Amino acid sequence: TYPNKFDQIMFGSVDEAWNLGATAVGATIYFGSEESSRQIVEVAQAFERAHELGMATILWCYTRNNGFKKDGVDYHTSADLTGQANHLGVTIQADIIKQKLPTNNGGYTAINFGKTHKKVYDELTTNHPIDLARYQVANCYMGRMGLINSGGESKGASDMAEAVTIADIN
């Protein structure tokens, strides 16, 4: 849409997908967006129906809110904010979560939102990329639900190096 508004709408039903022979359904939720509450409810209902039919569910699980940028730092890929989005995603029955690789941490404290504890940042995580990805996995029921990290905008010449880094971290 233009202008960009972080919203996804259902283009078909789970039953239609099932009748066409699909074995899985997917959806996107933009956690933090103005539409996220509606998206969570709609996707939860769709995923419940998919599981009734024996289908797998995949959720593109992204954070989107202008308030997630603070003092020149973009926390949209913060391990704690994306981890919370992942947790909400698996709670509404996503079998697989697609998430961007975390690039920083401390989004909750930076934007002064949510409840957290200093130990999360001082003792339970580090700023190492593998540790940040582990934090995301922990928020997917300690890895019982699948997590795929990939994506992001193309940067041209460094795309291959970034793909190798993501594969190594995963």
What residue ranges belong to the model's regions?
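Alpha/beta enzyme core
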Residues: 1-148, 154-170
